[in-house]
Every structure is written in C-alpha cells, then in structure tokens.
C-alpha cells in the first residue's frame, strides 16, 4: 500500500469512528428522556423548604434533630401528571433513611405536600427498597422479589373503608404469580450510602421497579376501584429518626 492509499485508509477509519461516536451521542440525546429537575433550584417542584434544598446539582431531603417530621412530606413535580412513562434517577440515602418515589399519586386535601399513591420504596437498610407500596392507601402491593397481580377489591368492602382489606401492612387481594429472586440476593445489588440508579416503568396496569438494573418488583393492578391511571410524581422524607436522602439526574420519558 503506497503513502497515498495509506492516507485515504486512515482517513476512512477516522471518518467511520466519527460517525459511530456521533451516532452513539445522538442515540443518548434522542432516547426520549428529558430532565424534570434542573439541578439548580426547585423550579417546577413544590415542597417544604424546611426539609428540601438543592446543592451541587443534587436535590436534598434532610431531617435533623431540630426539625423532626410529624408526618411524611413530599416534594412534588408540578408540571405534569403522567400516565404511561419511564422514570430514571439516581439516589443516595443515609443508613437510617426512609424515602420513596411516588407516581400516579394525588394530593391529600388540607395536608400540604402530602401524596397518596404508588411508591417505589427506598430505605437505607434495604428492607423495602424497590417494593411497591401504595402510600396512604392499599399499603404493600408487592414485596421485593415478587411479581403480583392485584385483583378487584371485593364488593363487600366499601371504598371508604379499604383498610379492612389490609393485614400486617399488606393488601390482601393480591396473587403472587412468580418469584423474581431471593430478597437477600436481590438486595446485594444495592450499594449502601452510595449512588444507586432507580428505573421505574409504568405502562397501562403494569408497574416495574428496577434498582441498578435489577427488577425488584412487578405489579399488574387490575383493581379498577382503587387503581390510579395518572397522577403526580414526588419524592419523600419520612417520619422517624434524622435522615438524609439525595436525588439527581431525574429524567422522564412519556410512553405513548
């Protein structure tokens, strides 16, 4: 191969690498996800500034001995109430922390910054992280490692008294259809006091919670009396001991 041909060959390789590199970047940019937290302030969100702040691109929820919570408090994304979507974020939580990511949730009247609805649970000891817990409503729908179908609530139970269908903080009209794995093994994939990635996929009646790429719970909600088909997204600080939870890179993708 002469010098001229070698030059064209090298140029061809460089051009191919450039195209591949830019193709990867385009895929990343056009993956359908967009940020809903700007990393600078609380624009688009509402919450109690006693507990929520922004620093270095991170949304921080903190409870100190001086400002102990009397009830759970959320910071709520106000700009939209999505129905079918994917939500990706990174979180870090202290050992005694208790938090969660709510979605398809509704505001509770006369209680500022309170939500009721589906939640992908998060706690520092990883007893509940990734399970599906319905805040202020049907309680636990699926524990870690469960694939569950929620059946319609019996007609004998009134909507005003759904707690009648709850035992030991767990909804009773549910069928475990498969195991996603052993809870102890699944939670080994969660890093303590470090950044983890949560990916929530909500499509029609199905809700899947992933942590660091591992499916922790999978719920299909067929309970037309109680299920929500759209609602607010929010993240929580929980009653209990002093705690700190941090969120960053919160991104949403609408599923059409």
Give the positions of each predicted feature.
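Carbohydrate-interacting regions of secretory-pathway proteins
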Residues: 24-256
């Amino acid at each position: 191969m002469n010098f001229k041909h070698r030059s064209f060959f090298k140029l061809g390789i460089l051009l191919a690498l450039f195209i591949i590199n830019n193709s990867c970047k385009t895929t990343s940019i056009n993956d359908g996800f967009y940020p809903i937290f700007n990393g600078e302030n609380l624009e688009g969100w509402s919450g109690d500034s006693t507990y929520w702040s922004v620093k270095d691109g991170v949304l921080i929820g903190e409870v100190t001995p001086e400002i102990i919570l009397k009830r759970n408090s959320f910071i709520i994304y106000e700009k939209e109430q999505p129905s079918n979507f994917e939500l990706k974020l990174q979180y870090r939580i202290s050992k005694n922390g208790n938090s969660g990511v709510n979605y398809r949730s509704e505001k509770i009247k006369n209680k500022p910054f309170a939500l009721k609805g589906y939640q992908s649970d998060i706690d520092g000891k990883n007893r509940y992280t990734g399970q599906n817990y319905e805040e202020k409503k049907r309680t636990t729908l699926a524990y870690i490692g469960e694939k569950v179908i929620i059946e319609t609530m019996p007609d004998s139970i009134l909507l005003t008294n759904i707690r009648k269908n709850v035992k030991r903080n767990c909804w009773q009209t549910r069928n475990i259809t498969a195991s996603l794995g052993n809870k102890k093994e699944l939670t080994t994939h969660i890093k303590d006091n470090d950044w983890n990635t949560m990916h929530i996929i909500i499509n029609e009646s199905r809700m899947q919670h992933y942590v660091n790429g591992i499916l922790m719970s999978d719920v299909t909600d067929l309970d037309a009396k109680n299920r929500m088909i759209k609602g607010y997204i929010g993240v929580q600080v929980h009653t209990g001991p002093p705690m700190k939870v941090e969120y960053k890179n919160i991104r949403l993708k609408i599923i059409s």
